[in-house]
């Protein structure tokens, strides 16, 4: 059963439809990149998957026992979030809030936070203040926090915005490793078409007048890709 099955979905807000007739499936272990024009509804789709907004029409179904609160979400960072005055460990542990019972975090949750930091190679930063870290280090911390929330699905919204090219390339490799080694399904919104076709298994290309969904190979052969990329093959 697919983790997410989207059939004939239209999305919008304040009476404005921004995406029409979306059709795609996300299976366990997939790495789906969502690309496309500005204003085509990519972030709106993310909000719908998270249950923050309703679909205007169609069906967006979650399978394999996946619950919205079990999605590990890494949003776009703003200035206030970058200046958050907490330790790295506290930020990572906050990823367990959705499963927290009672006043205190459990021993198992604390162990999960430690394991997530180890996966992202940030254990030595655990006592550092989050706002003192570099942009790349902060994104690793936030990804570790997202891992605390899920064993099934990571949802990443433009996770490399503002990072330099070297750090960006490293972050993409980390995400791919998490997908391959730990079997965690990844959905990522990205404007980086080159990295999308080189790391993902599937592409959802959103346009104002429709969408394309398929494997990376199918996408590279499509007219949608050729028109959007200017006819250049990036992979």
Regions found by a protein language model. Give the residues of each.
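H-loop (His-switch) and adjacent beta-strand-loop-beta switch element
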Residues: 202-216
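Helix N-cap at the start of a conserved alpha-helix in ABC-type nucleotide-binding domains
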Residues: 165-167
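Catalytic Walker B motif of ABC-type/P-loop ATPase nucleotide-binding domains
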Residues: 154-158
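Conserved ABC ATPase "signature" region
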Residues: 107-125
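H-loop/switch region of ABC-family ATPase nucleotide-binding domains
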Residues: 190-191
């Amino acid at each position: 059963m697919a983790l997410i099955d989207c059939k004939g979905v239209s999305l919008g807000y304040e009476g404005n439809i921004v995406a029409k007739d979306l059709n795609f499936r996300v299976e366990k272990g997939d790495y789906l990149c969502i690309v496309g024009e500005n204003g085509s509804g990519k972030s709106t789709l993310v909000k719908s998957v998270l249950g923050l907004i309703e679909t205007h029409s169609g069906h967006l179904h979650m399978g394999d026992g996946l619950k919205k609160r079990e999605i590990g979400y890494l949003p776009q960072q703003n200035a206030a979030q970058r200046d958050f005055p907490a330790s790295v460990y506290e930020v990572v542990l906050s990823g367990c809030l959705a499963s927290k019972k009672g006043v205190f975090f459990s021993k198992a949750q604390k162990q999960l936070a430690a394991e997530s930091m180890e996966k992202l190679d940030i254990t030595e930063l655990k006592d550092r203040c989050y706002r003192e870290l570099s942009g790349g280090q902060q994104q690793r911390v936030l990804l570790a926090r997202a891992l605390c929330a899920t064993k099934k699905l990571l949802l990443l919204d433009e996770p490399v915005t503002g990072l330099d090219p070297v750090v960006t390339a490293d972050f993409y490799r980390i995400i791919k490793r998490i997908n391959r080694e730990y079997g965690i399904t990844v959905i990522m919104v990205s404007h980086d078409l080159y990295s999308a076709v080189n790391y993902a298994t599937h592409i959802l290309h959103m346009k104002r007048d429709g969408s394309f969904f398929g494997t990376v190979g199918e996408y590279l052969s499509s007219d949608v890709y050729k028109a959007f990329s200017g006819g250049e093959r990036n992979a």
